[in-house]
Amino acid sequence: MKAEGPYFDELTAGQAFPTVPGVTLTEGLAAVHQSITGDRLALSLDTALAEEVTGASAGGGTGTGPGVGTGTGPGAGRPANPALVWDVAIGQSTVATQHVKANLFYRGLWFRRFPVIGDTLRTTTRVDGLRQNRPREGRAPTGLAALRITTVDQHERPVLDFWRCAMLPLRDPSGQTGHADDLDAAGASAKPASPAALLDGWRLDRFAAHGFWPQYGELVPGDVVEVAGGDVVSNAPELARLTLNIAAVHHDEQAAGGTRLVYGGHTIGLALSQAARALPGLVTVVGWFSCDHLAAVHEGDTLHSSVEIESAEALGAGGLVGLRSRVYSASGPQVLDWRFLAVLA
């Protein structure tokens, strides 16, 4: 008997993987995550500011709407960094993809509510579609699995509901599964939650009053901010362990073909940190339009980025901004093209 995740030819459409521990978002978890990804979002760092903006009490919020979650411990009114939330959800989903070779896409990653410190995340992963790849001479056979990842909090309120497409090897090198699903349909109809509903009751004017610059309206679509200084990628296996990510390529150099690969969310977390350096008025992230990993990242690489303003929509004392982060390795290649929707005040 071997304790391991499934290979592609052991998956079936509709198969569910609910047996993964829930994760409570604690101060310690957030602090370690910050030490690796460099969280600079003021709302997830400053409890007093979070109380001003969201109206949640530091002693534990009681909201039941779609926005901020309900906490139970000290500081529970402070929203968790969004990168911590999606890192945990993705990590919990790797119970289905321990043998993953690559992730081809993420779709529909839009927040349904913003968890706070003290909330617990529980994730179920289901196989939404399967397609075996065409054989390629000299390469082991692989297939693509479209996974629907549903994360709720301790009160069963939706937090995230998105799709991830993983490339997995077959256990039987001569296996023919016949799987030929149209994976373009996976998550294609996913709609973002209403940003106005997510931010219901938030006082963005209180955030803006703290003088973070540039504020909403001071940058316009087409503006590009180059972020001075890079960030070294460090503690990659520790981030994977922290978020329950058991994909072998992030832990085992043999599984990765000789050099461990950095978890894609690690690169995204550093990109978000650099975006917050460029735009200190960045309040939070509502969701992703697209996320393309263009080249492999390894521990010890240094990453630089630019942030482009692609769209802007006013929301009273602040607004929604469509941002595009382009991340490059110091060695030359672009490694990430990430387009996301954020709140700026």
Residue ranges and their predicted role:
Residues 1-52, 60, 68-74, 169-255, ...:
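Non-catalytic linker/capping segments at the edges of enzyme domains
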Residues 2-15, 117-200, 299, 306-345:
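HotDog/MaoC-like acyl-thioester-processing domains
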